[in-house]
Amino acid sequence: MSASGASYAASGVDIEAGDRAVALMRAAVSKTAGPEVIGGIGGFAGLFDASRLAMMRRPLLATSTDGVGTKVVIAQRMGSYGTIGIDLVGMVVDDLVVCGAEPLFMTDYIVCGKVVPERVAEIVGGIAEGCVLAGCALIGGETAEHPGHFGPDEFDLAGAATGVVEADSLLGPGQVKVGDVVLGLASSGLHSNGFSLVRQILDDADLDLDAELAELGSPLGAELATPTRIYARDCLALAQACQVHAFAHITGGGLAANVARVLPPDADALLNRASWTPPPVFGMLAGRGSVDSDEMEHVFNMGVGMTAVVAPADADKAIGLLTQRGVLAWPLGEIADGSGRAELTGRHHERS
């Protein structure tokens, strides 16, 4: 090819930069690997030794795929990329654990306008940290460079995870009974939902991410970037120790809509707002954006990141176990006769 001819590098794709990113992320990824992981990163496929599944009576493989939505824009604006990968793991594995499945391994996909090796490695480092928190291996991934489609500082990411659960330990609507107690597990904040609305509120109110807001007590950007809490190990420990009938991961659609997904057609969940006070970030967004309460509850988790439906005899034990594990939990409501709906009643207590 002549010096003036077309080339992949001239089109904006830097293969060498991708190779450098892989080299920089290698140590972080290796920390997620247990003895089941065969080989390291760089192969065409990730390999996982599933021999122990042969000891299970009827193993069911479970899979989940998700992303972090437009929370990536917050990371891009702040130039901080170390925790957005934790968000990704939380969104994926905590959907997986809802059915009682133990996460085994995860893969990721990062697409960007320009591969900056240090930035990609920082993102993957967060994914690896999240996998350690979740107890699963990061066995593969892809970094794609899309010049002209994404700006040089823009990126998106997604991931998929696979887990396993015994068929007779499967959680969900079939196990939920009238009289069960619904426990709320506190979120770490917004998690990774509703950020398109968040950004609209910030833009309309002309708020910068470095703004110090009295109602938050911390810089706005730091509050918004707080990583999603990963509940996987806590939920699995709870299911081992207590009569858990269902979990619900509170993501897009809010508390009521997600709890309704794990209800049988002849039962309702009655959820009491007076049982908890949403963290200040939710009140800040509602006030600064003039967002009504119905919209807030439909978009955001409002301080409840996961729910557990447990047998009433085990409710106190479950709360105690979660407390020991550092997860704030409380009785949020109960299961009653009904038609498969979740209903929020009462009013939140005002924050003192």
Residue ranges and their predicted role:
Residues A27-S188:
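Glycine-rich phosphate/pyrophosphate-binding loop regions near the starts of catalytic domains
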Residues A3-A10, A27, R119-A137, F150-L157, ...:
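Glycine-/charge-enriched secondary-structure boundary and capping motifs
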Residues G18, A54-M55, V68-K71, E166-S169, ...:
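Short, acidic Gly/Pro/Ser/Thr-rich loop/turn segments
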Residues P59-L61, G67-G69, P173, D210, ...:
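Acidic-glycine-rich active-site phosphate/pyrophosphate-binding loop
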Residues M1-E36:
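N-terminal amphipathic/basic leader segments beginning at the initiator methionine
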Residues D14, D66, G179, H249, ...:
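Residue-level signature of catalytic and energy-coupling elements of molecular machines
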Residues T65, D156, S169-E215, L220, ...:
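Short, acidic (Asp/Glu-rich) active-site segment that either coordinates a divalent metal cofactor
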Residues V22, A121-V124, F195:
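Hydrophobic face of alpha-helices
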